[in-house]
Amino acid sequence: MSAHTDRRHHVQSGLMRESLVDKSVIRSTETPVVRMLPEAHVVKIGGRSVLDAGRGVVYPVIETLARILATKKLILGVGGGVRTRHVFSIGLDLGLPTGVLAQLSAADANGNAHILGTLLAPYGVVAIPPEMFGHLLPLFIHAAPGVIFNGMPPYSLWEHPPGLGRIPPHRTDAGCFLLAECFGCKSLVLVKDVDGVYDKDPKDHAGASLIREISATELERRALPSLPFDRVLLRLLGTARLLKKFQVVNGHRPELIEAAINGKHVGSIVFAG
């Protein structure tokens, strides 16, 4: 059939005949990204840092979150805490691969998500099952003041092998970061049991100095032996398009969570660069 009589619609696609491993082609895909949930805040509640600490720590955090939820939209991620560490110990002893460890830790984090959801249920916030969370998040966040998820990115069996050891590198801090980046959220706050990032582990060194603000590049260069968040966040900050910083605050001082959500510098800020 000649070009003059062919009435079929032909879709023009810039990538149709291109190799997706060609660097020049990949460079051409650097285009603006839409922010799907620009007014929502992602807050990671540490499993070991907060939930495992018991009623005396958890209830004041719940009261603070309830107060924030009256005016802000929150996406709450939760870690697996001590149960995940126990499962890791068993799995490592049995020779389980990294992907299986990631799958098991997601189950522990999911349990903590339901605990947090039970405590926040009076405020209209519940835990959403991971299989539907990502697809329906915009609906949930517009229908309720906040939602809770298990924090684990769904790499599961496809988790990346770490450079050292077998612990999954993308854990709940990374999952919360990636969610905030994908949906273009307003901020990411990591709630821990320390005041922020220190030059040494403050639990072992009384004279450790708090680092109030630092770039991901500088933090990587320093190669500190201990960080209060997943180390892979430093690499993720370097490639993120929408999320350019996060703040680490102490959940044992719950008023700092609200201050951080309101844009105040009350912990350690790690920024891209």
Model-derived features: where do they sit?
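C-terminal catalytic "cap/lid" subdomain
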Residues: 2-273
